[in-house]
Design a protein with these regions (language model features):
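Extracytoplasmic/periplasmic substrate-recognition and gating elements
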Residues: 73, 102, 106-108, 180, ...
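A structural signal for short loop-to-beta-strand junctions that line the ligand-binding cleft
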Residues: 126, 133-134, 161-201, 260-262, ...
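Long, aromatic- and glycine/proline-rich binding clefts that accommodate carbohydrate-like moieties
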Residues: 359, 407-478
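Extracytoplasmic "Venus flytrap"/periplasmic binding protein-like
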Residues: 95-168, 182-184, 199-205, 209, ...
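Glycine-centered hinge/linker elements that transmit conformational signals in sensory
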Residues: 233-237, 271-274, 285-321, 350-352, ...
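Ser/Thr-rich, Proline-interspersed low-complexity disordered segments
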Residues: 35-69
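Periplasmic solute-binding protein
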Residues: 146-149, 155, 172-217, 263-286, ...
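Extracytoplasmic/periplasmic solute-binding protein
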Residues: 61, 179-188, 192, 220-289
């Protein structure tokens, strides 16, 4: 199993989205290398064209470049630890390389494409033989953590070139900061938001979820309550309905015949599911001891109770049933009232109808955490030419960013490009000339969520990454498919099993 498998679903989603993202070619849609469902129906729409705004120029070398006496410096760009090796993407990448080389005679940029399934082993071999590349990408957190500790701190290069980091939101910038420094610069980002179906709220007289962070929620009795997971539970139960029209709070409700669910968490990775309750990581400060953040333990128990006791969240068998999208994001069936998800779900949410909207992520213990995914290009510590590599990096993130974001279906991290992205979405039409997206989606909610990105990120490094993902998947499957478990015991067993795997990896 690939050690970045926690992001496999998202990467497969983003790769396959290229085919179905005839829907949103603004940045061609949304789904590029970080975690999404394995299979989702292809929207029946015709191809469209659009592009993000031209990138804001940043500091660039002054004066014309000349070829150094020894010839141009070779910089190798390695792909594809995630997205990037679809034929349509490769042609764009080769054009980007050609364009760069035509403008930079002092540097020869070489593109190395390795298919996703073999990329990790290939990069490991190259690094082991001291023949590694200079730049790797696009790569998400999971892919980069497979090579933890090998990424260059860009702080001095940013200062030296006066590279303008203010063009990105502070939350996005901080996302790439770690104990090792600024190990990345924002490129394509995927913030979280709450998708919801207004008609389901209207049907039973409920107010819609808040659209501004910090707002309270008005309950049916007029009381104002915090927008948190307790509120989500209450609303979720009222919005869960069986075939006889009873909701999950009523006597006679039949949990075996539910036709509409109230809430669906982002369950691609149980670390990510828990991150909505608080940022954290499984590795303690010493890098070798397993820790289960308190917020994560609470999140898993809340999720389990929501499936098996309160019945407002789908169990695994329901989630994987054909009636609820066969393991894909079930909100997109139009049978779920609310769902937390990343922005890449915009690609396929069209199947949920033409009247959905976006609300804010709820808080836990008074704090909002909106799980976050992001892709970028990184420079390896082993590069012999950091200055030249950084010049290439600036080009990929600057002049070439429009072409690459379009090819990778990425939402731009550069704030000046984000508004155009949503404008183009609103202009998309299906084969019959009807708008694909609802006319008044509150896209600002998605951008506002960036400031609440989970840091440390849920995909952060842990020992025995490969084996650990297997263990996490095993427990996730067990919890989703088995009622009556003692979750305190389950979480303790998970911790013990992870620790055993970590200890044996040294």
């Amino acid at each position: 199993m690939d050690p970045t498998r926690s992001s496999d679903r998202e990467r497969r989603h983003k790769a396959s989205t290229k085919a179905r993202l005839l829907v949103l070619l603004v940045v061609v849609g949304l789904a590029a290398l970080a975690c999404g469902p394995a299979s989702t129906p292809v929207p029946s729409v015709g191809p469209t064209t659009a592009a993000v705004a031209s990138p804001t120029p940043t500091a660039a070398p002054s004066g014309p470049e000349t070829i150094p006496p020894g010839g141009p410096v070779t910089i190798k760009w390695f792909c594809c630890l995630g997205t990037g090796n679809d034929p349509s993407q490769v042609s764009v990448e080769h054009q980007v390389v050609a364009d760069f080389n035509a403008k930079h005679p002092a540097i020869k940029l070489v593109f190395e494409e390795v298919s996703y399934t073999g990329a990790r082993d290939a990069l490991s071999t190259e690094l082991g033989s001291k023949a590694g590349p200079d730049i790797v990408g696009p790569v998400g957190v999971g892919g980069s953590e497979a090579f933890h500790g090998q990424w260059l701190d860009l702080t001095s290069l940013i200062q030296q070139t006066k590279y303008d980091m203010s063009q990105f939101g502070q939350g996005a910038n901080d996302f790439f900061k770690s104990s090792e420094g600024q190990i990345g610069i924002p490129f394509a980002i995927y913030p979280s938001e709450l998708y919801y179906e207004p008609a389901m709220f209207d049907e039973i007289g409920l107010k819609y979820p808040p659209h501004q962070y910090g707002q309270q929620y008005q309950m049916p009795d007029g009381s104002m309550v915090d927008w948190n997971y307790d509120t989500i539970r209450q609303l979720g139960m009222q919005l869960t309905v069986d075939k006889n029209g009873n909701d999950a709070t009523q006597a006679g409700f039949d949990p075996k015949s539910i036709v509409q669910y109230g809430f669906e968490p982002q369950r691609d990775d149980i670390r990510g599911l828990a991150a909505y309750f608080g940022a954290g990581q499984l590795a303690a400060a010493d890098g070798k001891t397993v820790q289960i953040p308190d917020a994560w333990a609470y999140a898993w128990k809340w999720w389990y109770q929501g499936m098996w006791t309160d019945h407002f969240i789908e169990t695994g068998p329901v989630y994987n049933s054909t009636a609820f999208n066969g393991g894909g994001y079930t909100f997109n069936t139009g049978k779920v009232a609310m769902q937390e998800n990343f922005l890449w779900n915009v690609c396929c949410v069209t199947d949920a109808g033409r009247h959905w909207d976006l609300g804010t992520i709820p808080s836990y213990n008074g704090k909002v955490t909106a799980a976050f995914n992001a892709d970028t290009f990184r420079i390896l510590k082993s590069t012999k030419h950091p200055n030249e590599a950084f010049e290439v990096l600036q080009y990929l993130l600057g002049d070439a960013s429009t072409k690459l974001l379009n090819a990778y279906s990425g939402f731009p991290a550069r704030t000046t490009d984000q508004g155009n992205f949503f404008t183009q979405l609103e202009q998309q039409k299906d084969a019959k000339g009807k708008p694909i997206y609802p006319p008044n989606v509150d896209w600002k909610v998605a951008v506002d969520g960036i400031q609440f990105a989970d840091n440390p990120n849920f995909e952060a490094f842990m020992p025995a990454y490969n084996k650990s993902l297997d263990i996490l998947t095993k427990y996730s499957t067990r919890w989703q498919s088995t009622p009556g478990l003692n979750m305190d015991t389950e979480i303790a067993n998970l911790k013990t099993e992870l620790q055993t795997a970590w200890d044996s990896s040294h």
